[in-house]
Amino acid sequence: MTSHPPRNLGLDLVRATEAAALAAARWMGVGKPDEADQAAAEAMYGVLNTLDMQGRIVVGEEGKLGVHSPLDSGRMVGTGNGPEVDVVVDPVDGRRRLAQGHSDAISVVGVAPRDSMWSPSPAVYMEKIVVDRAAADAMVPECIDAPAAWTLALVARVKKKPVRDLVVFVLERPRHEHLVEEIRSAGARVLLRSDGDIAGAMMAAHPLIDVDLLMGAGGIAEGVIAACVVKALGGMMLGRLAPQTEEEWAAVRAAGLDTKAVLSCGELVRGNEIFFAATGITDGLMLEGVRLHGSEAETESIVLRAETGTRRKIHTVHRLTD
C-alpha cells in the first residue's frame, strides 16, 4: 500500500464537492443556513467514504451547527484502504450567502499526506494575507504588522499597476472597520463579503480573477483550507494566530501556542502532494452555481493538484434520482 495520494485523487474528490453542492442548492435563498450545511455535510460524507483512502478529518464542521456532524474533526473517512491522508472540508463556504441567495457559495475539500496540515487547536482565528503568484515572492512576514498602505504599495509595484486598481477581499466584520478605512485611504478598492473567505482566498490567488489580495482575520479552519488552494495555485499566504476573545486568548496561552509566529502557506500545509476540489453552489466570480432542470442538474467545479500545478475546470450533468 502506497503512502502517497494517487495522482487522480482530485478527480475523485470532486464527486464529493458535487454531491455537497447538489444537496445545498435545494436550500438556496430559503433562509436556513444550518439545514443547508447539514444536508451538504451528509452528502459529502457519503461520497468520501467510497474513496480508497484512510482519511482523517483535520479541519471539519464542529462548532458550526451546535450539533455533531459526520464531518467533525477527528472523524475517519474513506474505505480504509489506500494512503493515509489528512482531509479538510467545508461543505458550504458562504453559508449566509447561500441562505440569502447571494453569489459565491461553494463546497470544498482538500487532501494532503497524513500529518502535513497545521492544526493549532484550540485556537479559532488567524490573520491572513493572500496574493497570487505574480506577487508571491514579494510577500514578507512584516506584511502582517505593516500598515495596509505599505503592503498595497508592495503588491502594486510587483504587479505593475497603480494602487487605485487593486481590489482587496475583506470579510465584513466590525473588527475590520479600521482595515477597510486603511485600504480605502490608500486608494485601493474593497470587496466586502458577509462570509466565504475560502472563496475569497481562491479569488485572490487565482491569476485570472480581478481580486489582488485577501486581508483580515478569519477562521483557522478556513485558513488551512485556503492554504491548500493558494499553494496549488502558486500564490502566497501569510498567517498568524489572532485570538478574538479573552476566552480564546486564555485557551491559546494554556496550549502554549505561539501568537507571534508568521507562517506561510508552505508551513500551514507541508509538501506538494496536495489536492483540492471545489464546486459552485451559487453563481460566482470563479464558478457557476448549480443549475436544476427537473430530472437533471448541472455543476461546475475546479480541481487543483499542487505537485504539477494542474488546474481543471469540470462541467458535469447529473441525472437526479429523487
Residue ranges and their predicted role:
Residues 82-93, 97-118:
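DPxDG-like acidic metal-binding loop motif
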